[in-house]
Regions:
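Exposed acidic/polar residues on beta-strands and adjacent loops within beta-sheet cores, strongest
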Residues: 1-226
Length: 226
């Protein structure tokens, strides 16, 4: 049995949860790293936030600490994002991130798109004749905090298939703290490719103050082509 993201999305459409927006900043010139920003307005407090993340694509791991700015004064979201960008600039320079160098945008399924499969996605790399397939698998996991809140939680496995060969991009052994207390559903949103480097952005759904919240999880991987 797996957690059902569509039901979470249906609740999100009916209730005022906190659905973050995504800003893909770009890849480094060699494609080894990339950076992205997630931003929005917190449910409950109504204050803006902006968080920058830096990914080592070859290792599918964080390249360095994230940068987060949360408003406490009632400033505009634009002002909060500007402060976060300024704070993130040293890391963007350190990792050689080129703003706007987003490569080829191969797939886009925003949260408003209800006509696609949540856990599978097929796309084609420009120089490869065969398609790739991403498949998400969710494994319900017991968590004392989530059980006390009567909220679901799920571990994530992500498989990538190409030319009949499957490889694992992500396999959770435990719930990462970076996803919040109770990540209860996952969904493919965007896929980018640059210099044979893959960047996949997933929606991660958790229970929020006023309804389901959504944040982003990014996966990176070097690609093989035929």
């Amino acid at each position: 049995m797996s957690v059902d993201p569509p039901s979470v999305r249906a609740q999100a459409a009916l209730r005022a949860g906190d659905l973050a927006e995504l800003n893909f900043v770009g890849f480094s010139e060699d494609g080894a790293r990339f950076a992205y920003e997630q931003f929005g307005v917190q449910d409950g407090s109504g204050f803006g936030y902006s968080q920058f993340y830096f990914v080592d694509a070859a290792k599918n791991a964080w390249a360095g600490p994230s940068v987060a700015v949360e408003d406490e004064k009632g400033d505009s979201l634009e002002a909060v994002r500007a402060r976060a960008r300024k704070a993130a600039e040293p890391s963007l320079q350190k990792f050689g991130i080129v703003s706007g160098n987003t490569g080829d945008h191969l797939l886009s399924h925003p949260t408003t798109d209800l006509g696609v499969e949540d856990r599978t996605a097929k796309f084609r790399f420009p120089s490869a004749p065969e398609p790739y397939e991403l498949r998400l698998e969710e494994t319900p996991v017991k968590n004392a905090v989530c059980e006390e809140r009567s909220q679901p939680a799920a571990l994530l496995t992500v498989n990538l298939t190409f030319g009949g060969n499957a490889r694992v991009l992500q396999k959770d052994a435990a719930l990462p703290r970076s996803r919040g207390a109770c990540p209860g559903g996952y969904r493919v949103q965007d896929v980018y490719v640059y210099k044979n480097t893959l960047a996949v952005f997933l929606n991660v759904y958790t229970a929020g103050f006023e309804g389901p919240d959504m944040r982003y999880l990014a996966l990176g991987a070097p690609l093989e082509t035929k």
